[in-house]
């Protein structure tokens, strides 16, 4: 389908694609295009072509068409540029839609009915000694799983002991050599969680050198299962539970963490935004809460997160 680095799409109610009646995308590195606007009722025609890095396009494909009727539910997300302008600039940023509540949490968290369990899980993580392993990367997946508890407790209570444990995990990995397990998608995801969430919560407690090492490690790991935006896989794949359950969230978080400083991360984030926009209406979850590609938790968070950003 794609014969060069990019695809360009044309969408129009005119079968001849008259310029003044056609929505023309920029050349895109993925196999999808969202117009980000309500489409008028009637027949719409679309076509695509490949475009090389020099901007030279191939001949247009055959014409395809679909019909918009008045009974089709409408959902429109803003263009990615609007979304990107509203991204958080500082750290922490992963759960920016919760920041106002998290500022108040340390004073009230102890009275919350789930506080006891939250602290219990984090204290269980404190009792681990994974960072003392002679080969810490062999237990890095377990570190990532424990970081879920530590991050939640630290952001909720502001108790430094939880941050110290995350930092100990990360520093043990930074001082060691990655092993071959980093090609496994579950393992990669757990290690990415450890790195992104420690970077997020402890940004000012890390040295500039440590932050640089973490960033380098993240993108080394991401190349296996998360830096996939140019592969044309998920936008063309009908059913991929595993990607939507885990890898999408992890890819989104890597993009969010580094989009303002690294082009690859910005591209990853834009891909996630466009992929979610393209697939959400087909799922029906925007109407009934269901997601036919697996668990919906990360999508509900993303929906809330996008909404918070774009309405500011």
Segments predicted by a language model, with ranges:
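Short strand-edge motifs at loop-to-beta-strand transitions and within beta-strands
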Residues: 31-34, 64
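Short beta-strand segments within Ig-like beta-sandwich modules, predominantly Fibronectin type-III
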Residues: 23-29
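Extracellular fibronectin type III
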Residues: 51-72
């Amino acid at each position: 389908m794609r014969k060069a680095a990019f695809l360009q799409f044309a969408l129009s109610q005119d079968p001849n694609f008259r310029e003044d009646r056609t929505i023309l995308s920029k050349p895109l590195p993925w196999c999808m295009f969202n117009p980000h606007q309500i489409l008028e009722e009637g027949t719409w025609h679309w076509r695509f072509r490949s475009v090389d890095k020099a901007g030279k396009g191939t001949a247009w494909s055959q014409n395809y068409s679909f019909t918009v009727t008045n009974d089709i539910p409408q959902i429109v997300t803003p263009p990615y540029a609007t979304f990107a302008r509203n991204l958080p600039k500082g750290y922490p940023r992963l759960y920016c839609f919760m920041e106002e509540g998290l500022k108040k949490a340390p004073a009230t968290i102890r009275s919350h009915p789930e506080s006891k369990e939250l602290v219990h899980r984090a204290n269980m993580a404190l009792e681990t000694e994974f960072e003392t392993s002679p080969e810490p990367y062999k237990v890095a997946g377990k570190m990532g799983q424990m970081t879920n508890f530590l991050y939640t407790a630290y952001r909720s209570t502001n108790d430094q002991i939880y941050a110290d444990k995350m930092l100990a995990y990360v520093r043990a990995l930074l001082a060691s050599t990655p092993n071959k397990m980093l090609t496994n998608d579950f393992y990669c995801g757990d290690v990415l969680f450890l790195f992104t969430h420690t970077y997020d919560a402890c940004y000012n407690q890390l040295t500039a050198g440590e932050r640089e090492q973490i960033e380098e490690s993240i993108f080394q790991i991401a190349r296996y299962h998360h830096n996939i935006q140019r592969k044309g896989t998920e936008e063309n794949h009908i059913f991929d539970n595993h990607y939507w359950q885990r890898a999408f969230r992890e890819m989104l978080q890597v993009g969010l963490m580094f989009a303002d400083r690294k082009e690859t991360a910005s591209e990853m984030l834009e891909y996630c935004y466009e992929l979610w926009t393209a697939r959400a209406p087909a799922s029906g979850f925007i109407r009934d809460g269901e997601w036919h590609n697996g668990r919906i938790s990360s999508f509900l968070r993303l929906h809330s997160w996008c909404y918070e950003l774009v309405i500011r």
